Amino acid sequence: MILFILLVGTLLLMIGIPTIARSQERIIKIDGSSTVYPITEAVAEEFQKMKKGAVKVTVGISGTGGGFKKFSRGETDISDASRPIVKKEIDACKEIGIEYIELPVAYDGLAVMVNPKNNWVTSMTVAELKKIWEPAAERKITKWNQVNPAWPDVPLKLYGPGVDSGTFDYFTEAIVGKSRSSRGDFTASEDDNVLVQGIASDRGGLGFFGYAYYAENPDKLKLVAIDGGKGPILPSEKTVMDGTYNPLSRPIFIYVNKKSSERPEVKEFIEFYLKNAPTLVKQVKYIPLPEKAYKLASERFSKRVTGTVFGGEAKIGMKIEDLLKLEEKK
């Protein structure tokens, strides 16, 4: 009988050990933009190595809009965003009392790409892109020669981020003139690698997503120069930073739940993020902000300054110096 009691006690103790371990495990939950994902994932990997398993960081992809939905329900600590938070998302956070800290982490250019076998396009105007992507084009503009008569009678197959994507929001506002205003007959995915494969396998394919994904796949895609009114410009670190790649250059962000930031592991993660961003951003083919911008972001985080400097709107074609001015005013 004594032996039986000892065995039962030992089993209960063994069963309890994982429960205790789980209760002590520290987890940071992140979700949102597929564009910002490579940066945050790189930071998370390095941070977890440093912490030697003491902190787990999960990084999901549901698009900027999808990420903000989770963030505004209190399901995540940090939200990756490829555009500033908009009014309906601000209101959703207010509804349940979520305060957030807005931190720019890098600069990105939206790249427009075609299949490498496309030998008729090297550049496109904003007007031509609008003609392709505006809602009125749905099931009507289906061949390249309908966009420009100098181009061949080849089927036009379109690829782009889904409607929960901040990249979709930004592109439609910059090109069509209204956020989320787009034809619906295109292959959409929150996974940019799916879009890469689609364009790469279709001679008449055209699509758009963050420049970093092109930089990872230059042999599979052909980059298109964009004419915003001052001649065709290709996206590059230089043209994005100096603002000449217009209107498809933009800052990208993380948003931190203020309450979550009071947890030591979240505080340490954000400090690590901002300190290491200049190096890690470059490693994953994005464009780092100036040192001054990271310093301002670090100051904002240390003071727990909440809210957005963008007033609930996207700022199309914003230059780095414009971003710095907004940061300094906050």
Locations of the language-model features?
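A short, compositionally biased domain-edge/stem linker segment
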Residues: G16-R22
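Bacterial N-terminal signal peptides
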Residues: F4-G16
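Flexible loop/hinge segments at secondary-structure junctions
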Residues: R22-K330
